[in-house]
Amino acid sequence: MTTKSAKRDSSTSATDRKFTGLRNFNLGMGFLHLVQGIFMIAVSNDTTYPIYTNFLNFDVATRSLNPSPELVYELPFGIAVACFLLISAVAHFYLATIGYQRYVKNLKKGMNPVRFYEYALSSSLMIVLIGMLVGIWDLGAIILIFAVNATMNLFGNMMELHNQHTEKTNWTAFIY
């Protein structure tokens, strides 16, 4: 009985060391992303990209509908890229500090929902910024691109939630 108890204790301490290592890793990545985000803000220039709304107006003279783009906002691009990094920093700091106990509890179940929430925000922001680089400046398109990408990431969370107690991985979340 002593050997079983000793094996359990050594595997528990190995698991605890692994979680402590992940905590330290998240702290390190949090600081790295924070420094990168601050650096990005410091070195970014005043480049902006426009965001427009595009509605149709009826032209009485020509009896036709004509686009009527209206500038809504000038997005400071460097700051927006820095936000991508700062979102990651916040997520890493959360996991290493106030969210650590929940993080460990979820990892033991084979889940990491914070990852998908962070991805839903940060990767959606980055996809929107890439779209803006190639001329997607319509507010409606930007909102939809963000929403579709965020939804795809949240399906990853749904997949982990559904598969935490299954023998075989169910990929249904990604079929939709």
Model regions and ranges:
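N-terminal acidic, proline/glycine-rich, low-complexity intrinsically disordered segments
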Residues: 1-7
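General N-terminal targeting signals
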Residues: 2, 57-58, 110, 133-134, ...
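N-terminal topogenic module of multi-pass integral membrane proteins
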Residues: 8-107, 113-119
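Membrane-proximal helix-loop-helix units in multi-pass membrane proteins
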Residues: 123-176
